[in-house]
């Protein structure tokens, strides 16, 4: 379980895993920056109750709350009509999420002819996962409704994960930088333990590209479906095939053990 910038769900996940007879790796997905570019860093096997993770959540979600209205303003400036109360009704807490903005905008008949939303409607170029794609394209870094936030340095995030029992893996690199070897090499130099080569954002070529780099550096080539429920309707939980998931599981658990991290085995 690797929620964005939060480890708060781990106790509940641990109870459910025990009830269902499942193994559980506690984790987190930390938002961070390297040379001005945003990345997501997975921490597997962390001591989820350590105060540093609550501090990360407080900082990041505090920023998200502070910029929420600015994001809504920026989306409306593109000619998209928003029912703001409907957006807020979908959001947990008091910070908006781009997937909820997309859902409300696409369901509003007043936006039927909005050209900005055309790619996210059935048959459109970005309709495979319309809500998430809207978030990346419109509200993400470089998008027309992007509102910047300040995230911790990438190397600092790697160090925090290592210092608290975890294994540091770069999430969905192809989504952030396509196939960029020079930048990947720089990120590896910060102390990465793995690259998420197999995920829903990667085609076969991109998976092979990051698998090759991981192998060259003796890193794990991990997998993750990036399952987000309704936000990504084309993804089933636990999919996106690694050629040998059992071997990866064993290697990951061994690495977590070396870090004195945690894996809950049923």
Label each region the model flagged.
Residues 76, 80, 106-111, 144, ...:
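Short helix-capping and hinge/turn segments at secondary-structure transitions, especially at repeat
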Residues 90-91, 139-148:
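Surface-exposed cleft-lining segments at the edges of enzyme active sites
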Residues 1-100, 104, 190, 195-231, ...:
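A metal-dependent hydrolase metal-coordination microenvironment
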Residues 138-140, 169-171, 194-197:
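Short beta-strands and strand-loop turn motifs
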Residues 180, 204-207, 220-265:
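Catalytic core of soluble alpha/beta enzymes
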């Amino acid at each position: 379980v690797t929620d964005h910038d939060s480890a708060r769900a781990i106790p509940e996940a641990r109870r459910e895993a025990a009830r269902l007879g499942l193994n559980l790796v506690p984790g987190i997905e930390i938002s961070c920056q390297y040379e001005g570019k945003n990345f997501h860093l997975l921490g597997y096997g962390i001591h989820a109750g350590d105060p540093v993770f609550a501090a990360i959540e407080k900082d990041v979600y505090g920023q998200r709350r502070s910029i929420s209205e600015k994001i809504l303003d920026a989306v409306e400036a593109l000619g998209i009509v928003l029912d703001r109360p409907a957006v807020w009704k979908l959001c947990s807490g008091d910070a908006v999420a781009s997937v909820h903005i997309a859902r409300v905008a696409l369901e509003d008949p007043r936006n039927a002819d909005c050209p900005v939303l055309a790619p996210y409607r059935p048959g459109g170029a970005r309709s495979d996962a319309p809500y998430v794609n809207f978030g990346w394209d419109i509200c993400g870094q470089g998008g027309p409704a992007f509102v910047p936030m300040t995230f911790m340095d990438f190397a600092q995030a790697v160090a925090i994960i290592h210092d608290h029992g975890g294994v540091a893996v770069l999430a969905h690199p192809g989504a952030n930088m396509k196939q960029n070897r020079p930048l990947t090499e720089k990120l590896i130099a910060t102390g990465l333990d793995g690259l998420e080569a197999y995920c829903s954002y990667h085609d076969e070529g991109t998976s092979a590209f990051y698998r090759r780099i991981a192998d060259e550096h003796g890193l794990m080539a991990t997998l993750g479906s990036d399952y987000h429920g309704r936000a990504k309707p084309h993804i089933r939980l636990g999919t996106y095939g690694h050629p040998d998931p059992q071997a990866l599981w064993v290697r990951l658990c061994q690495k977590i053990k070396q870090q004195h991290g945690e894996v809950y085995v049923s």
